Amino acid sequence: MLFTLTNLKAQKASKINVEYSDFADINQTEIPDALLLTGNVRVSHDGVIFTCNKAYVFQKENYLKAFGEVQMVQGDTLFLNSKYAEYNGEVKQAYATGNVIMRSPESTLVTDTINFNRNTQEAF
């Protein structure tokens, strides 16, 4: 008998990358373990760009909280705008609320709250 073993490794999620902000700070008292970004914030993760007015990036958890004029752009096909969003870089899941508009070449969705799974490209 011949057995073939395949080396299966869990893929390690890439980290959320801070590309730009007017100001960055760390305040362990108010928001522990977060990088506080304000003004013209731009962060990226595996082909998606987030822009907003203010963000908290929790680097250990690979997690983002974005505030004010939030936009998520995935390639040239998906645009999501909202007042507030959260994004989990470990599982590529986004949550957005507050005047949410999601646009793709096929459709436009307007709602108050949305969850988006980047792995399956499903919104619910």
Task: Tell me the role of every PLM-derived stretch.
Residues 10-124:
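N-terminal amphipathic/hydrophobic interface segments
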Residues 2-9:
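C-terminal segment of classical bacterial N-terminal signal peptides
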